[in-house]
Amino acid sequence: VSCADILTMATRQFDNVYYKNLQQGK
């Protein structure tokens, strides 16, 4: 696993959490 892969996974996780929070905020 390369650093780029870890960064991509972390970003994806953050996007998922952020999106869920956005949906709940409505």
Curated annotation (Swiss-Prot):
For the ligand (Ca(2+)), the binding residues are 15
Query: What EC number(s) are associated with this protein in UniProt?
Result: 1.11.1.7
Keyword Oxidoreductase carried by entry: yes
Q: Does the keyword DNA damage apply?
A: no
Q: Which UniProt keywords apply?
A: Calcium, Heme, Hydrogen peroxide, Iron, Metal-binding, Oxidoreductase, Peroxidase, Secreted
Please give the superkingdom of this protein's source: Eukaryota
- Report TM segments: none
List the coiled-coil residues.
none
EC supergroup of this enzyme: oxidoreductase
Q: What role does this protein play?
A: Removal of H(2)O(2), oxidation of toxic reductants, biosynthesis and degradation of lignin, suberization, auxin catabolism, response to environmental stresses such as wounding, pathogen attack and oxidative stress. These functions might be dependent on each isozyme/isoform in each plant tissue.
The entry's protein name is Peroxidase 1
Tell me which species this is from: Vitis vinifera
For this protein's source organism, the top of the classification is: Eukaryota, Viridiplantae, Streptophyta, Embryophyta, Tracheophyta
